[in-house]
Every structure is written in C-alpha cells, then in structure tokens.
A protein has these predicted regions:
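N-terminal hydrophobic or amphipathic helices and topogenic motifs
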Residues: 22-25, 132-182
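Short loop->beta-strand "edge-of-pocket" segments that line small-molecule binding or catalytic clefts
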Residues: 25-45
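Short beta-strand-centered segments that line the small-molecule binding cleft or hinge
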Residues: 1-7, 78
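A ligand-binding cleft/hinge motif common to bilobed small-molecule-binding domains
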Residues: 75-104
Length: 182
C-alpha cells in the first residue's frame, strides 16, 4: 500500500457549539437533531461502529434515519438550522463557518500490486505525492494531514489484523486411483 493522507471525522456543529456537544452520548442525552450520511457510505459505517463502541442504539440519535448525500450537505443542513449536528469532516464544517468536534483519525492509503510499484505511472504518482506543493496543499485542508504520503508501506504495518490467503496447493493424483463413470 502507498500512504496517502490522514483525515479527521467528527461532529459538525453550529458556531460556538451552543449545545456543548462533545460525543455521540451527548447527542443522545440532549436530544439534538442529528443529520446522518446515507447507508453504505464510509461515514455511516464509522458512525455505526462508534455507536456500538459507546453502547448506544442508533435510534438514540434523533434524526438517525435522515440523511444527506455529502459532508458538504451535512454542513449546509447544520448552517441552515435544519439539524443541530451531523457527522462529517472538518473541512466541510470550516467552509460553512461552523465548529467541529474531532472524534476519529482515519488513514487513507492507495493499494496496488507489488509488481506495479516499479511501473512509471506508479512511480510518478508516488513522486507527486511527496512534492512540497502537494504536501502544502494537504496541510492547508482543515482536518487533513499528509501522513506517509507516497511512501510504500507493508500491509502488515497498516492493517496488522490482515492475513494474506495462502495459495492452495493443487491436489496430486499421483498414487491415487481415479474412477470416472460415463
């Protein structure tokens, strides 16, 4: 895998965070109006995982079934007063003049076959990801950081739980009888 970026996901709230929300439990406790991301999005999967870790039922969030198609749309819903809070990325919150409560750091990587690492296109991409201009661009985005940008990383380092499937050996029929009926 090739390092790409780290980003922060968290709570998008009104400027000044008037409800004092710091966690998913706070949203449930206060009855704050929540705006969700659609089923199947990475943010929704993350939210459901965080709810499970906190021991909260999804229905504890008022508005859990309401969703917007993007982080920008979540921020717009909060800015317009249609929701008190939503899960999203910091850059979307800051673009609308909203506050942001960080919850999770996510690491992003690019995957390719090991044999592709020596290909000119892959080398060019890796070089681009390590240029000062690209690194500065990543640093300028609120909530993003160029973590290991362009570096080749071992899968076992990035995903310690991952195990490669071993190739199954072909069954040898030597010294075995095979009877076919037609």
């Amino acid at each position: 895998v090739i390092g790409f970026a780290q980003r922060t996901q968290g709570l998008i709230v009104a400027s000044g965070n008037p409800l004092g929300l710091q966690s998913l439990a706070d949203i449930a406790r206060t009855g704050a109006r929540f705006m969700n991301r659609p089923l199947g999005t990475g943010t929704r999967v993350l939210l459901d995982d965080l709810l499970a870790q906190a021991g909260l039922d999804a229905q504890a969030l008022q508005g859990y079934t309401l969703n917007e198609p993007s982080h920008t749309a979540i921020a717009q819903a909060v800015a317009a007063g249609a929701a008190d809070v939503g899960m999203g990325i910091e850059v979307a919150a800051r673009a609308r003049g909203l506050d942001f409560v960080p919850l999770v750091q996510e690491r992003y990587h690019l995957a390719c076959l090991k044999a592709s690492l020596d290909q000119p296109a892959t080398q060019a991409l890796r070089s681009l990801l390590q240029t000062p201009d690209w690194l500065a661009h990543m640093q300028a985005l609120h909530g993003y950081a160029p973590l290991h940008c362009g570096e080749v990383l071992a899968m076992s380092t990035v995903l310690p739980w991952w195990q490669f499937a071993r190739k199954k050996h072909a069954t040898s029929f030597r010294n075995k009888s095979l009877l076919l009926h037609f």
